[in-house]
């Protein structure tokens, strides 16, 4: 599923008029905190809504947002939802500046913005996603330790033979600074250790990584699970643990993030309605998993802004 800017499809004039998704008393933004998915029921309700919702941010879950937006606009033809996935940092900066109504992020806003910016935003945790290393089809390595990943992504390990593979130079495809996927990966691999290694390329989006990994031999990168594509590259184990959702729910697989959608406390009604929909059963009950993500309700652990993991 390649990343692309999502443009509004106008469904005005649908015969019979579709039921609105907006509930009475929208509280997704503007209150002390966002409602949890468990608090949200069916999306069907009585009031209509109109307006324009715009977003930017993480490319890792852009496809989930796009799929939800399609359903939301089907039922709310007077609402336009559009946006793109230019990275968590850009999305958070944009929503804080008011140039978009929603900022999508793989990381907590506290890690990218100043405190006075964060206090004006409301966080909606819409999903959890695993992220893991991927290697080219010709690479004969199917498991790496965190220490080996640290060596590769710091430039200390440069040949596949050093980690059990063939004698070939490792091509490191990194993500650009500001990427939430990169921040999540580096936090899991390096902890608090500072790292400034660009690799052989720094790519903008998850879709760019998919494309480059599919056409480059001896390469390594990292992607969220929803962008894994075994026709182009191989997802590998970390510390002997398979990169799959079941191993993320209890933190057996260590590289994962919560997907956040931030809005301003004084967000407009259309934005509130769409974010309420993201937390509704219509999205959380089925769509999240269909798109390769994990419902927040399925997690046995939680991770805070500092990266500390604790049991629910």
Language-model features: where?
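Exported/periplasmic ABC-transporter solute-binding proteins
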Residues: 2-6, 30-97, 101-114, 121-312
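N-terminal secretory signal peptides
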Residues: 1-6, 14-27
